[in-house]
Amino acid sequence: MPLDDEIVGEEEGAPETVPVPRSLVPHLSETAILLDIDGTLLELMPTPREVWVPPGLSKTLNRLLARTNGALALVSGRSLNDIDLIFAPEQYPAVGGHGAEMRIDPDNESVDSHAPPMDRELKRRLAAIAKLSPGILLEDKGYSLALHYRLAPHAEKAIYAAVSLIRADLPNAPIEILPGKCVCEIKHSGFTKATGVRELMTREPFKGRRPLFIGDDVTDETVFGIMPDYDGLAFSVGRRAQGVQGHFDSPSDVREFLSHLLDDERDAALP
């Protein structure tokens, strides 16, 4: 796999990524592990509800949570409720809704919310776009709305055109369009995964640790961009993104890497 002491590949037109000496990867007692879910920990599926947690992953996450003294968090566009449904019965610290909500302690029901739910009329207009073609799936995340077209790739241009028209009709609406892997997501502007991670890093047990973030999609690039502020490490999945120290080919490689973090006697060597 590409995460070793050699130079990994680079995105076309981007500068070469820098080799990652094993000695730079911090001990788990000094690390905050931050993980995207879809396309990073778990394989992408035709529909959001089809994702599943492979055997052994929850055990690995639980052990990492213990070894980092609680400094492990999932960072996702999904809501916290949705994250909990996927990993049930386990619950983890998490930044959900692209930074709209955050939970530090799974044993504490307190959830920090940073945005109101999306306007109902705006949501109704956006939801109508799903009727453009069979195969377009609507996912209401509360703080955002996603139009998945993995089953209708031909509808991509029509979806973005319709969203752009709605946005033009409502120029003052505080919304942002997030293009993803066969998904067009619309959310409140003013918060991102990066803003969520920044707040997370001010709170115990994450405060003062070096973050290690792994993500796969365009929305994860905001977090890649802030890792230098914390002397952190960033890795992409499935593509060679800019601003990362290396990449994994697939979620299975990510899961293997996380297992190796536990297997190595130093807790921090790359496989």
PLM feature spans:
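Asp-based phosphoryl-transfer active-site loop
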Residues: 26-46, 74, 197
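Active-site phosphate-binding/coordination module
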Residues: 52-141
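Residue-level signal for inorganic ion chemistry
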Residues: 39, 94, 147, 197, ...
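Charged, glycine-interspersed solvent-exposed loop segments at helix/strand-loop junctions
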Residues: 136-153, 174-187
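Substrate-recognition "cap/lid" segment bordering the active-site pocket of phosphatases
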Residues: 97, 103-124, 178-208
